[in-house]
Amino acid sequence: MREALRSLLVALQFLTRLPVRLSAMPTPEQFGRAVLCYPLVGVLIGVVLYAAARSLDGTPPLLQAALLLSLWVALSGALHLDGLADMADAWVGGLGDRERTLAIMKDPRSGPVAVVVLVLVLLLKFSALAALLGQGEAGLLPLAPWLARSSLPLLFLTTPYARPGGLGQAIAEHLPARSLPWVLGVSFGLALAFGLAGLLALLVTLMLFAWLRSRFLARLGGTTGDTAGALVELTECAVLVALAL
């Protein structure tokens, strides 16, 4: 039980800006085990968003959507948005070359492509949130962060790490590979409790995952922390849009 709790705390500290403080820096093995808790972190984010949406009942949908999106970004500390921005710059500037793409992803500066992609993704999220709230479907909000963070263990389990060294490789090398399929099966299966909406969200998640993973492999031969972050953001966006249509 103590190890399970520590794994959850490591995952919360890594994926969110919630005030979680550990007594010592987690080991690579602990970072690897924490991947089991990524779906649960997504559930917790979703519950916070749902509770916030309910507390804002009666607020105009556009303002409510803006406040929820701001909270959403704050909860993750824009961690995954940063990965999306880096990947967008690298995918365009890399000109199809693996080494050039990896080099651009390490550059902390953001170019115009990154800015445009971030604006478009946030605009789509905002619009989809406003539509869902206007339809009285706030109860579906947890599906987006939940399934997006469930896709991370699937990515790490099925895709080699493209860049030697760093935290990403340490996580990849210490994945609890035997337990992950069970965790993923439960996480994806529970999404079906949302009925047809859950089935739609799950199908969108898996289809987008398969397509993005194929792009990562074709360009990089694997994944990186930035592409993992981009996967989260794009999955959240796609699920929200699909549910709002």
From Swiss-Prot:
Pathway per the UniProt entry: Cofactor biosynthesis; adenosylcobalamin biosynthesis; adenosylcobalamin from cob(II)yrinate a,c-diamide: step 7/7
Protein name: Adenosylcobinamide-GDP ribazoletransferase
Gene: cobS
Transmembrane annotation, as ranges: 31-51, 61-81, 113-133, 138-158, 192-212
Cellular component GO terms held in the UniProt record: plasma membrane
GO MF, one annotated term: cobalamin 5'-phosphate synthase activity
HAMAP family, sorted: CobS
Cellular localisation: Cell inner membrane
Required cofactor(s): Mg(2+)
Keywords: Cell inner membrane, Cell membrane, Cobalamin biosynthesis, Magnesium, Membrane, Transferase, Transmembrane, Transmembrane helix
